[in-house]
Each structure stands twice: as C-alpha cells, then as structure tokens.
Design a protein with these regions (language model features):
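Cytoplasmic helix-loop-helix junction between adjacent transmembrane helices
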Residues: 116-154
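Residue-level signature of mid-helix packing/kink "hotspots" within the transmembrane helices
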Residues: 39, 67-75, 160
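Membrane-interface helix termini in secondary transporters
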Residues: 47, 78-79, 168
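Short hydrophobic/alpha-helical segments at membrane-entry points of transmembrane helices
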Residues: 27, 111-117
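Conserved MFS/SLC helix-loop-helix module at the cytosolic interface between two early adjacent transmembrane helices
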Residues: 72-110
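Helix-loop-helix hairpin linking two adjacent transmembrane segments in secondary transporters
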Residues: 151-176
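Membrane-interface helix caps of multi-pass secondary transporters
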Residues: 41-53
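Small-residue-rich segments within alpha-helical transmembrane domains of MFS-like 12-TM solute carriers
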Residues: 35, 39, 121-129, 160
Length: 176
C-alpha cells in the first residue's frame, strides 16, 4: 500500500461528533461566563458609586476602561492563540477575567479599581474571537449556524444569570 493510500482514511463520524460537542461545550461555557462577567459590571457600578463617591462620568470612564480593553485586545488574543493554542489562551483569559473581579474586591481606591477593570477586560478579550474560532473549526458548513446560535444563546444565559445571582447575594452579603 502506498503512503498516499495510508493518508486517505475514512473520517470517523463518532470522533467528529465528539469534537463538535467538546468545542461547543467549551465555547458555550466560556461565553456564558465571560458575558456574565461583562454584565456583572452593571450591577457593581452603583455599588462602586456609593463606595467611592463617584459621579456618573467617573462610572462611565470605568466602564469604558473595561470595554475598551476588552475590544482592544481581541486581535492580539488571536495572535496568542496561533502561537499557544486557542483553548489554552481562552482558559488563561477566563482565569484572568475572574482574577480582575477578585482584584476589584480588594480595591481600596478608584485607581486600583480601574487597574482591576483593565485586568478583567484583558482576560475577557479572549472569549469572542477564540470561542467563535473553535466553533468555526469544529462545525462544517451550515451546521455552524446552529452551533453559533447555541453559542450566542449561552452568552445571553450568562448575561442573565451572573448579574441576577450577584444582585441576590448583595442582599445578604457585602460586595467584597
């Protein structure tokens, strides 16, 4: 048998399904968590306003730091993924985004809080480009449409769930 014939193997449909499920699970989990993190800022803004005596302009600037960092580092996240792998960079970004919120909880002033939001935005910048890429590579043709719809739905679940849980917890626990 020739080397060319050895390279021509019939794809295993069970393996392809497993890859699809794994990619969709990772992408949906990351999207729910990251979008939940992102919308959690809206619950925290009035808390920070009260805690640090901030006006609306300062709150808007803080939100801009988070969103601007998130937006600005999406393309560099793609470059990092090409070098280190999308799943690795996505996992590290998710951890970094969560760490940004931990830092925010330790903030004793506005400058530290803004730095924490920068860290959170930096971590959050990995999700959209890398999770979308995982889905695009795992699903062929029109099958990617349903997968992307599921992925977007998962993000909306995160937007709804994390802020709601945080709002409930703030009733019984301090924000820190």
């Amino acid at each position: 048998m020739s080397a060319a014939a050895d390279d021509m193997q019939v794809p295993n449909p069970d393996s392809a399904k497993s890859t699809e499920r794994r990619a969709l699970g990772v992408a949906c989990g990351a999207h729910a968590l990251h979008d939940g993190y992102t919308d959690l800022v809206y619950i925290l803004l009035p808390v920070w306003q009260n805690e640090f005596g901030l006006g609306f302009a300062a709150l808007g600037l803080m939100r801009t730091v988070f969103s601007g960092t998130l937006a600005s580092f999406q393309i560099p996240a793609g470059f990092l993924a090409e070098r280190f792998g999308a799943v690795t960079v996505l996992a590290l970004g998710t951890a970094l985004a969560g760490f940004g919120y931990v830092l925010a909880g330790f903030s004793n002033g506005v400058a530290f809080l803004v730095a924490a939001l920068f860290v959170g935005g930096l971590g959050a910048s990995t999700q959209h480009p890398l999770a979308s890429s995982l889905i695009a590579h795992a699903f062929a043709g029109s099958r990617s449409l349903k997968a992307l719809g599921t992925y977007n739905f998962a993000g909306d679940i995160g937007k709804m769930t994390l802020p709601a849980v945080a709002a409930f917890l703030f009733i019984v626990l301090p924000w820190r």
